[in-house]
Amino acid sequence: MSTPSQRTWQFESFYHTIINARDVDETIAFYELLGFEILDDRRSTVWPDDQGAFFGLIPDIKGRAALMRLPADPNGPMLDIIEWQVPRVDFPARSPEVVPRVLAFRVENVKAAFQELRALGVTFTKPQPNEMPEVGIVASAACEDPNGNLIEIIELEPGLRHSKIGTVYREDEG
C-alpha cells in the first residue's frame, strides 16, 4: 500500500453531503431560512439507469433533489437535498437516547441568527445560545431541520479553526 507521499492522487476538498428529505420543498425552504441558495435544482431530473447500482441500491431509483450552497462560500461543500421516491427512506422518531446526524455551521453573530431564526419559527433545543468562552466558543445553538437532523450553529473567537474543548475538558490520564 502506498503512503500519502507516494500517491499519484489525493483528496482535494469536501464536496457535498446528502440530506435525505421527507419533503424536498419543505427542506429547501428550511435551508433557505439558514441562508443557503439553490445551485442546481434537480427536482424534475430523471436519473440515469445505473445510478442505483452506483449507490448499491435497486436499479430504478427515483428522487427529487436540489444542490444548495452558502453564498459566502461559493466553492465550499454543498448540501444535496434528496427526497427519495424509490426506494423510500425511513425517518425514525427522534429520541434523546439516539444521536441524530449533526451538521455544524460556523456563523457570524450566532445570537443575532438565533433571534431572527426563532422569530421566523425555527425551534431551538434551548431557550438561549450557549456561551463557552473558556474553549473559544462565543456562542452556539442547535435546532432540527424538517427531517430530524440536528443543526448546530457556532461562532468561535476570531482566529480559531475549532474550539479548545478537547484540551480544556480532558480526563486525567494518570
Walk through the language-model features, giving the residues of each.
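A generic structural micro-feature
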Residues: W9, L57-K62, R94-E97
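Core segments of cupin and vicinal oxygen chelate
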Residues: N20-N75, A119, G136, V168-Y169
